[in-house]
């Protein structure tokens, strides 16, 4: 009789444990469904936010192009690309360049109207892209241009304002630039 009670006890425990596990699994499924729904909503909001930013950038692009593209192009016409090691450093010369890079790297070049700083002659915006790679693999940097033709590195950012694996290498190369290196095609 003692053996029978022990068997019944084990069977009861197993059934209780199984019922408990079934409840836990139900709760996990509910939790997972909630998490997945939350993620889907977040993705949709991110997508809508991104579309809105792109729409605003395109609208700004149209408005600015109508007003003063020539002024920006006049300021940037003497600045050309520079090739150093495995990188190509290229200035953003048009409003379209600013919009494209801003959208591609998901950074605030258009929203904060960096092209105005370039038009004023206060700074120059360049991309640093490894040879054979796309803009997303590179970084964007701002060079402050002083009246005596000295330059200094400002911001240096990659995709979504984060540094790339080449961040330090690019930074060190840019610090060696002189104003003369940026006028016309040159190799540092």
Label each region the model flagged.
Residues 1-188:
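Catalytic-core elements of nucleic-acid end-processing and repair enzymes
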């Amino acid at each position: 009789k003692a053996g029978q009670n022990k068997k019944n006890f084990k069977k009861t425990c197993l059934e209780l444990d199984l019922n408990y596990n079934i409840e836990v699994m139900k709760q996990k499924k509910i939790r997972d469904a909630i998490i997945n729904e939350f993620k889907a909503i977040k993705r949709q909001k991110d997508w809508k936010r991104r579309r809105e930013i792109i729409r605003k950038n395109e609208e700004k692009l149209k408005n600015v192009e109508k007003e003063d593209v020539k002024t920006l192009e006049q300021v940037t016409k003497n600045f050309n690309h520079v090739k150093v090691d495995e990188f190509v450093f290229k200035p953003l010369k048009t409003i379209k360049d600013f919009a494209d890079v801003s959208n591609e790297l998901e950074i605030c070049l258009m929203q904060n109207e960096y092209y105005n700083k370039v038009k004023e002659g206060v700074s120059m915006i360049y991309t640093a892209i490894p040879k054979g790679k796309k803009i997303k693999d590179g970084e964007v940097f701002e060079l402050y241009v002083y009246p005596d033709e000295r330059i200094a590195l400002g911001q240096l950012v990659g995709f979504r304002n984060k540094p790339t694996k080449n961040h330090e290498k690019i930074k060190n190369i840019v610090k060696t630039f002189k104003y003369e290196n940026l006028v016309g095609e040159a190799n540092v």
